[in-house]
């Protein structure tokens, strides 16, 4: 689980509720229907049904764990390269590999698949992964664009109701509540939930894409029978300073 996402969301909502004091006046059924119901339906309208039905699972990824650490992947790739160079590709078959993308690449090596086909297959899968993740983040970005607009629509609805009932003082308060609370709900939904979710999905997608690129280059290096130490230096160039230092230290 991504502790930062959970703590950040709960903390933001808790601070907002604390600032409200009594949350009762900030709850309005009409405003909820306009902003939450309206934005969901509008997002469904601009999305495909499979994308819409899968949004809960995609959102869950924002709160799920992070991809493997790239420096750990480099160390594992170097270990696999050492085994392959010493005992041959077939010796890789019994190795425990938790990363599914790496496991696929190693399985293709063990099967004797042509190097060009291995690279093409892995690169295509990486591209498809990035496309899926981009679509998931795009869904929440689209929803984040719509939510404040629905808040503005609710504000206009509330103002029309208020102006149409100026002769009835009792109707002015509820109408004004709709006008103000829809704007609040739209801003909260977009800026506290949806935009951070989209950004977190993009961050994790970039991290996973980097890992996959490391795997592709590492698997191809193993296929070519390269020196594991040289492979560690080469793959380390993909990382930032601290990650590279950790990888080099682990490699010895």
Specify the residue positions occupied by each region the protein language model found:
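N-terminal membrane topogenic signal
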Residues: 1-6
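Helix-termination/interfacial motifs at the ends of transmembrane alpha-helices
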Residues: 7-23, 127-204
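Large intracellular
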Residues: 14-137, 208-252
């Amino acid at each position: 689980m991504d502790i930062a996402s959970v703590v950040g969301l709960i903390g933001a909502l808790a601070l907002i509720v604390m600032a409200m004091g009594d949350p009762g006046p900030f709850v309005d059924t009409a405003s909820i229907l306009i902003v939450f119901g309206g934005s969901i339906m509008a997002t469904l309208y601009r999305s495909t049904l499979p994308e819409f039905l899968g949004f809960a699972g995609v959102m869950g990824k924002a709160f799920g764990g992070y991809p493997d650490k790239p420096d750990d992947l480099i160390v594992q790739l170097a270990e696999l390269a050492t085994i392959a160079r010493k005992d041959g590709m077939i010796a890789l078959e019994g190795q425990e590999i938790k990363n599914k993308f790496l496991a696929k690449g190693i399985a293709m090596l063990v099967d004797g698949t042509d190097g060009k086909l291995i690279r093409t297959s892995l690169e295509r899968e990486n591209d498809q992964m990035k496309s899926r993740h981009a679509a998931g983040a795009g869904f929440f970005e689209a929803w984040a664009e719509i939510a404040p607009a629905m808040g503005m629509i609710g504000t206009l609805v509330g103002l029309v109701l208020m102006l149409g009932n100026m002769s009835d003082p009792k109707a002015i308060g509820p109408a004004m509540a709709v006008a103000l609370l829809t704007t609040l709900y739209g801003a909260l939904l977009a800026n506290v939930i949806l935009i951070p979710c989209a950004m977190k999905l993009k961050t994790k997608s970039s991290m996973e894409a980097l890992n996959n690129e490391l795997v592709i280059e590492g698997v191809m290096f193993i296929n070519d029978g390269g020196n594991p130490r040289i492979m560690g230096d080469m793959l380390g160039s993909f990382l930032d300073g601290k990650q590279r230092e950790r990888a080099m230290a682990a490699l010895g």
